[in-house]
Structure formats: structure tokens, C-alpha cells
Amino acid sequence: GTXXXITIIR
């Protein structure tokens, strides 16, 4: 997902 800046699963 695209929430905030640090994401593992996009």
C-alpha cells in the first residue's frame, strides 16, 4: 500500500 513512506507490500 502507499500510505506514509515506509511500506513493504506495495
UniProtKB/Swiss-Prot annotation:
It comes from the Eukaryota. This is Unknown protein 1.
